[in-house]
Regions:
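A general structural signal for short secondary-structure junctions and capping/turn motifs
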Residues: 19-20, 51, 65-69
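A short, contiguous, amphipathic alpha-helix enriched in charged residues
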Residues: 31-63, 100, 104-111
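Homeobox/homeodomain signature
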Residues: 17-19, 49, 85
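Broad gene-expression machinery/nucleic-acid interaction feature
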Residues: 24-26, 56-60, 71-75
């Protein structure tokens, strides 16, 4: 019986014939700050069960955070071979495919949003990159503009502006605690805050102006004659 992580990975290594064989895939998962540690454990277990253990993949994870709850994340290790009735089977190469990785990211966002909604929280996450999300908002703004729904167009455009920034850098636990890491986080947060302020300023134009999506020029909203 395997009682610890060390026992698990020692056993996995013994099943491999090659000394340089890859025995695990490791990845880091960012957890929502809005959830408690217990809620994040429940969230993570549901996701791992659905995407991995139910499919014969062994998962081993540990959750880390800092004192002010600004960096909750999990380090997850999964086996490269699926479990069968007779033990470890062949290595599943499809787990390395971009399509599979995309589906894992997509479902992680889906499961997170389900938990956030269930807990009555308004925040939501997306598996898409910031650039992809921004382009979607711009397309929606153009469609709203074509439909003469200028208020909705402004809302979509404001969201696009909020998303028009580089992603916050993913820092290791060691670097997060360093002075350099904290300075980097402050710079990233400042850029994010400025984007939010710019978006807020655009939202204030609703009802008083029209923003041309293509040229991003602002025109006063003409009042209807009495």
């Amino acid at each position: 019986m395997i009682k610890s992580s060390n026992d698990l990975w020692n056993y996995v290594e013994k099943t491999e014939k090659r000394k340089d064989a890859r025995t695990a895939k490791e990845f880091k998962i960012t957890l929502p700050c809005e959830l408690t540690n217990e809620q994040n454990i429940k969230l993570l277990r549901e996701y791992l069960k659905k995407n991995f253990t139910d499919k014969g993949i062994i998962c081993d994870f540990v959750i880390h955070n800092d004192k002010d709850n600004k960096n909750p994340h999990a380090h997850v290790m999964i086996t490269t071979r699926e479990i069968t009735l007779s033990g470890f089977g062949k290595k599943v190469r499809s787990w390395d495919e971009e399509k599979t990785l995309h589906e894992w990211r997509k479902d992680w966002a889906k499961v997170q949003n389900q938990h956030l909604k269930k807990l009555g929280l308004k925040s939501r996450v997306s598996h898409r990159t910031l650039e992809e999300q921004k382009n979607i908002m711009i397309d929606l703004a153009k469609k709203a503009e074509d439909a003469k729904d200028f208020d909705k167009s402004i809302l979509y455009l404001a969201k696009a502006i909020e998303l028009d920034r580089p992603p916050m850098q993913n820092l290791s636990r060691k670097k997060w605690r360093s002075k350099e890491g904290q300075e980097q986080r402050k710079r990233d947060q400042a850029i994010r805050d400025r984007a939010k302020q710019d978006a807020r300023a655009v939202r204030l134009l609703r009802g008083v102006a029209v923003v041309d999506v293509a040229s991003f020029t602002v025109h006063p909203l003409q009042k209807k004659e009495q």
